[in-house]
């Protein structure tokens, strides 16, 4: 039985643990970027899709709030209050009126600054793990409400699956479609790209008349998902930030060309990049495309993934 932390900070009784939470990476099947808003964000119309590349966060009892980390790019991340994991834990504690005491350990597989929402995923994992550890008993929607203040992608990664994102991306509604498994190849580049820098570059390209026509509505993408045909879906994948990512990292054009030459149905830059994702017709084709990309000097690594998968979950 789990008992919540008491607001007076006394030692709780009956809290079990550790709690391990797996959280997926995110790709955008459609990323329509509108004009810059007065608050400094862009209005988005995006379709999020959770894929089977996961980080894992373990939460244990502690007498302070501490974070350790291993895996993909772990040495490049701060472990203090600037880290989204720590910020998420503190936000949940403040919301629930409990002291933020936990020992958190993060195993990373999602590349840093790769357009896969790795930091947002870890924040979602922290909310779910600490909710379990502290017995705060919040619903998914309540956790997503806290998540919205941490980052635009964080609410989606609480839920997972496939979802429509509007506003700055934080307003999430699930996409209702018959269950389908989509097969992806994820080509990870060396280094990362800053999301704010990518948005500023898109604004610059648009001001100069050098950007593609904005994608706008995601209706065609949502209709393609309902058809459950990868070839139809391939024809409507799109990302307004791709122009910016290619301008900032021209080598990504060779990655996209190589993936499609290897047999992918379509390839796009994931989010703000520099990761590229390719849709394959089936699992065997995905393995073959990943193998061919791995043999070329166009990405740091290529791995297969499937989607959609669940969001942050204990287990």
Curated annotation (Swiss-Prot):
Active site, per annotation: 26, 153
Residue stretches in coiled coil: none
EC annotation from Swiss-Prot or TrEMBL: 2.7.1.148
Transport recorded as keyword: no
Keywords: ATP-binding, Isoprene biosynthesis, Kinase, Nucleotide-binding, Transferase
Pathway in which this enzyme or protein is active: Isoprenoid biosynthesis; isopentenyl diphosphate biosynthesis via DXP pathway; isopentenyl diphosphate from 1-deoxy-D-xylulose 5-phosphate: step 3/6
Binding positions (ATP): 111-121
Catalytic activity entry: 4-CDP-2-C-methyl-D-erythritol + ATP = 4-CDP-2-C-methyl-D-erythritol 2-phosphate + ADP + H(+)
SUPFAM superfamilies: GHMP Kinase, C-terminal domain, Ribosomal protein S5 domain 2-like
Keyword Metal-binding annotated: no
Covalent S-S links between cysteines: none
GO biological process: isopentenyl diphosphate biosynthetic process, methylerythritol 4-phosphate pathway; terpenoid biosynthetic process
Function: Catalyzes the phosphorylation of the position 2 hydroxy group of 4-diphosphocytidyl-2C-methyl-D-erythritol.
HAMAP family: IspE
Family statement drawn from the similarity comment of this UniProt entry: Belongs to the GHMP kinase family. IspE subfamily.
Listed name of the protein: 4-diphosphocytidyl-2-C-methyl-D-erythritol kinase
Native source organism of the sequence: Salinispora arenicola (strain CNS-205)
């Amino acid at each position: 039985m789990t008992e919540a932390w008491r607001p007076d900070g006394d030692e709780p009784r009956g809290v079990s643990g550790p709690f391990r939470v797996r959280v997926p990476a995110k790709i955008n099947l459609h990323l329509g970027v509108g004009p810059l808003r007065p608050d400094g964000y862009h209005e988005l119309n995006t379709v999020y899709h959770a894929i089977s590349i996961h980080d894992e966060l373990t939460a244990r009892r502690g007498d302070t709030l501490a974070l350790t980390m291993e895996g993909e790019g772990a040495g490049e991340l701060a472990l203090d209050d600037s880290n989204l994991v720590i910020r998420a834990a503190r936000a949940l504690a403040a919301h629930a009126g409990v002291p933020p005491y936990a020992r958190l350990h993060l195993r990373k597989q999602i590349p840093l600054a790769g357009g896969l929402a790795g930091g947002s995923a870890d924040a979602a994992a922290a909310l779910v793990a600490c909710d379990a550890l502290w017995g705060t008993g919040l619903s998914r929607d309540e956790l997503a409400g806290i998540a919205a203040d941490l980052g635009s992608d964080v609410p989606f990664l609480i839920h997972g699956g496939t979802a429509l994102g509007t506003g700055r991306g934080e307003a999430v509604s699930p996409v209702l479609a018959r269950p389908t498994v989509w097969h992806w190849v994820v080509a990870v580049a060396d280094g990362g790209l800053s999301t704010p820098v990518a948005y500023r570059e898109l604004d610059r390209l648009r001001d100069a008349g050098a950007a593609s026509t904005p994608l706008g509505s995601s209706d065609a993408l949502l209709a393609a998902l309902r058809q459950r045909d990868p070839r139809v879906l391939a024809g409507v994948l799109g990302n307004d930030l791709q122009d910016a990512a290619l301008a900032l990292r021209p080598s990504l054009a060779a990655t996209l060309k190589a993936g499609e030459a290897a047999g992918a149905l379509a390839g796009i830059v994931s989010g703000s990049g520099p990761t590229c994702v390719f849709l394959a017709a089936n699992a065997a084709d995905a393995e073959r495309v990943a193998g061919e990309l791995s043999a070329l000097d166009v990405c740091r690594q290529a791995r297969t993934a499937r989607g959609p998968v669940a969001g942050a979950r204990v287990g």
